[in-house]
């Protein structure tokens, strides 16, 4: 995206202030009830046996708490925590430096693990399975293989795109955990806790208003809370209520469904310029002056989740709900526009 959006689930520079809002223990973590319960059992068992926890893979959309849970896992285990990301580990030597500095049962967190290079993955396999590094030292005839024993550690990987993980890497994670979008009630609890941490008063309806527009994502809820708090402070309000939250979020162009100006521009372009669709993703990328991957990975997922957009074999198609949200009349359309099977398209 050309501009950072307030409702993007991706991490932004101003999200650094979120650290204070993050829960420190599983008991404080809101949502993901089954995943939390299972993690607590696995952590308790590892502590009782005084063993390293099996490798953990967190899968889910951005902003749902994968990094926070990784930090909590290390804290609950009472071990060290090291964090990095797939793109940062450029070569096998970078990974070797990280692994050889880990203490017994430490947690190594790799965000965006699907972006590891094949060469780095090859080094990671024996490290995960046998806690050994197999490295080639030197080049040509003088090259030799060296085995280095590692401390037993726990690798925690996080990915938003599980389909890009290779099968050998995926199969080495003993504890796969899928994170789902949060309910409004769960987000209300997160907003209320965030307000307490920030020392800001908030009413139940004020928390609900922020939660409803947070797109099922705690990161967005925290970001909206901080911005609404600014409006409340400027108005000398004692607490954030629904009226203040509605005014602030309206001024920030986040509507009642959590859509921002870019979302509405996307929907309006299809509705007004292409009769509601179908229209290909390349056409939409050109119309909005945005790269195709931004359309597919950032804009469209939430619109599909809300039921405003369909991906059909012939292109993107607006639903009746989208026209109602835009306040437009739905045009009469040929049922054939939905394609033979109504499945997804490649977006060409």
From Swiss-Prot:
Mg(2+) binds at residue 67. DNA binds at residues 292, 311, 316. Residues 183-253 are annotated as: Small ATPAse domain (RuvB-S). Keywords: ATP-binding, Cytoplasm, DNA damage, DNA recombination, DNA repair, DNA-binding, Hydrolase, Nucleotide-binding. Residues 256-348 are annotated as: Head domain (RuvB-H). One of its GO terms (biological process) is DNA repair. ATP binds at residues 21-22, 63, 66-68, 129-131, 172, 182, 219. PANTHER family: HOLLIDAY JUNCTION BRANCH MIGRATION COMPLEX SUBUNIT RUVB, PTHR42848. Has 3 domains, the large (RuvB-L) and small ATPase (RuvB-S) domains and the C-terminal head (RuvB-H) domain. The head domain binds DNA, while the ATPase domains jointly bind ATP, ADP or are empty depending on the state of the subunit in the translocation cycle. During a single DNA translocation step the structure of each domain remains the same, but their relative positions change. Belongs to the RuvB family. Homohexamer. Forms an RuvA(8)-RuvB(12)-Holliday junction (HJ) complex. HJ DNA is sandwiched between 2 RuvA tetramers; dsDNA enters through RuvA and exits via RuvB. An RuvB hexamer assembles on each DNA strand where it exits the tetramer. Each RuvB hexamer is contacted by two RuvA subunits (via domain III) on 2 adjacent RuvB subunits; this complex drives branch migration. In the full resolvosome a probable DNA-RuvA(4)-RuvB(12)-RuvC(2) complex forms which resolves the HJ. This is Holliday junction branch migration complex subunit RuvB. It comes from Rhodopseudomonas palustris (strain BisB5). The gene is ruvB.
């Amino acid at each position: 995206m050309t501009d950072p959006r307030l409702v993007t689930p991706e991490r932004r520079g101003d999200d650094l202030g979120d650290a204070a809002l993050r829960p420190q223990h599983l008991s404080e973590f809101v949502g993901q009830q089954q995943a939390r319960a299972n993690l607590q059992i696995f952590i308790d068992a590892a502590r009782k046996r005084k063993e390293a926890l099996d490798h953990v893979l967190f899968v889910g959309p951005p902003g749902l708490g994968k990094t926070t849970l990784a930090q909590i896992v290390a804290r609950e285990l009472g071990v060290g925590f090291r964090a990095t990301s797939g793109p940062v580990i450029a070569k096998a030597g970078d990974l070797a430096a990280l692994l050889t500095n880990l203490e017994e049962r430490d947690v190594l967190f790799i965000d965006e693990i699907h972006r590891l290079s094949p060469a780095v993955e090859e080094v990671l396999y024996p490290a995960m399975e046998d806690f050994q590094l197999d490295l080639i030292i030197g080049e040509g005839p003088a090259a030799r293989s060296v085995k280095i024993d590692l401390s037993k550690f726990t690798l925690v990987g996080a990915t938003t795109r599980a389909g890009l993980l290779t099968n050998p890497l995926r199969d080495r994670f003993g504890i796969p955990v899928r994170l789902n979008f949060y309910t409004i009630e769960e987000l209300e609890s997160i907003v209320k806790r965030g307000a307490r941490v920030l020392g800001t008063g908030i009413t139940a309806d004020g928390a609900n208003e922020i939660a409803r527009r947070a797109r099922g994502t705690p990161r967005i809820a925290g970001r909206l809370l901080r911005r609404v708090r600014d409006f409340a402070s400027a108005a000398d309000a004692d607490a954030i209520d629904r009226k203040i939250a509605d005014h602030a979020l309206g001024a920030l162009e986040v509507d009642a469904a959590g859509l921002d100006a870019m979302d509405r521009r996307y929907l309006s372009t299809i509705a007004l310029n292409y009769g509601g669709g179908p229209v290909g993703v390349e056409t939409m990328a050109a119309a909005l002056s945005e790269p195709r991957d931004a359309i597919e990975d950032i804009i469209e997922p939430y619109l599909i989740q809300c039921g405003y957009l369909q991906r059909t074999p012939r292109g993107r198609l607006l639903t009746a709900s989208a026209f109602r949200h835009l306040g437009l009349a739905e045009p009469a359309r040929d049922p054939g526009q939905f394609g033979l099977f109504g499945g997804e398209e490649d977006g060409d």
